[in-house]
Amino acid sequence: MNADPLETDAALPEQFRIRRDKRARLLAEGRDPYPVAIERTHTLAEVRAAYPDLATDSATDDIVGIAGRVIFARNSGKLCFATLQDGDGTNLQVMISLNKVGSETLDAWKVDVDLGDIVYVHGNVISSRSGELSVLADSWQMVSKSLRPLPVAHKEMSEESRVRQRYVDLIVCPQVRIVAHQRIAVIRAIRTALERRGFLEVETPMLQTLAGGAAARPFVTHSNALDIDLYLRIAPELFLKRCIVGGFDKVFELNRVFRNEGADSTHSPEFSMLETYQTYGTYDDSAVVTREIIQEVADEAIGTRQLQMPDDSVYDIDGEWETIQMYPSLSAVLGEEITPQTSVDRLRAIADRLGRGIGPEILDKPSYGHGRLVEQLWEYTVGNTLSAPTFVKDFPVETTPLTRQHRSIPGVTEKWDLYLRGVELATGYSELNDPVVQRERFGQQVRAAAAEEDEAMALDEEFLAALEYAMPPCTGTGMGIDRLLMSLTGLSIRETVLFPIVRPHSN
């Protein structure tokens, strides 16, 4: 029989052992430190809302039952003070007085309660002599005994600890709670904005037999039931287009996607993605909708379109946004004309001139053709400099296999990327719906894979079969929710996700 580590581990911190012993004593005395339920009548926020202007040093006859986490406590001889915190961050003072509860109940509070405990307090609403809205207890109860002490201050937590113990971070840092609620508001506002425009939300497979819809390396798993390898999806695109073939007019999906690639301040292997598809629209139409939705989301989740960053800089996302074209903007910064006809040798010569600090991927990838070279050069010379919201449009054909060729400009496709603060935030297409051309594009990708191109898209015969039933012209967009919140707040991707992936502690 395995020994209980709580009973045998002498290396436990002293505070842990003290609190564990209190738990054991409460149980021995018949006082459950983890009761199944309590009779809470009000949240802390409801108490504050009900008594906004209670006069200093006054009392009411109103009785409430409240619960919260003890984040501050001060014990004196005949009167104890504590600050309780609710899940939304609301604080409220409670007072335990000898005259009100008697010596036994007061002494139990002093002995049993530690910072971090969740307690229930029953009593009447008053205002203290200092004017602090409070609940004067006539009884109290332990609701959940905390065996681990909270950090004294947020600064005590390292960045790694904040990520690993986000639950503690949420307790001690108000800004973390604010960002978590902003994320909820962002997702709610996106759904509301799309539904108001007639979009229907659908669900498509997370597990797929082919990894398609984007150029990315997938996570691979195996189905024991089917005895085949499956892939965590890298994008929902190809299934959403099947919905368009089947007759949906406007669809969207907001859910998780997975890419087995690097993790840094702007990338995560698992992230939330919004994709939308609208029939009989072009990439110009989807750019307008994307701008409007982001502005509406800022209104709802942040409360302003003047985005205040942690470094005190301000980004204005109101009004119309600038639009530039990839080839002309790259030509302007390089000082020479770059077109879809510019040779690979010339592009590599430019990369060599710029140096490894500008384009390491270019120098280390001999398989890169014209399109990848142009995109990499543009990203390093133009994209990273775009602070204000900017649409860059008209991409090389070979890097956009699912996109319609431009109506009037040879060698480019009708695609835009949206940049804000130097980060790609969203992308939009006039979708390719010619099944013959789509098959040719997939063939080019397969050949790229044969040339050791890690991010080539697989040939999806089932998707091609769907296109052969005729898909109406449409426009599609994709936007990372994590990056949207990054753009709205100026935070890193790990700070916008409640529980980002971290390497587990070794034993």
Curated annotation (Swiss-Prot):
GO terms under biological process: lysyl-tRNA aminoacylation
GO cellular component, one term: cytosol
EC class of the enzyme, as a word: ligase
Database matches in InterPro entries: Aa-tRNA-synt_II, aa-tRNA-synth_II, aa-tRNA-synth_II/BPL/LPL, Lys-tRNA-ligase_II, Lys-tRNA-ligase_II_N, Lys-tRNA-synth_II_C, NA-bd_OB-fold, NA-bd_OB_tRNA
Gene Ontology MF: a single term: lysine-tRNA ligase activity
Cofactor: Mg(2+)
PROSITE patterns for this protein: AA_TRNA_LIGASE_II
UniProt-annotated location(s): Cytoplasm
Paired cysteines (S-S): none
Assembly: Homodimer.
Family: Belongs to the class-II aminoacyl-tRNA synthetase family.
Name of the protein in question: Lysine--tRNA ligase
Organism: Mycobacterium leprae (strain TN)
Organism classification: Bacteria, Bacillati, Actinomycetota, Actinomycetes, Mycobacteriales
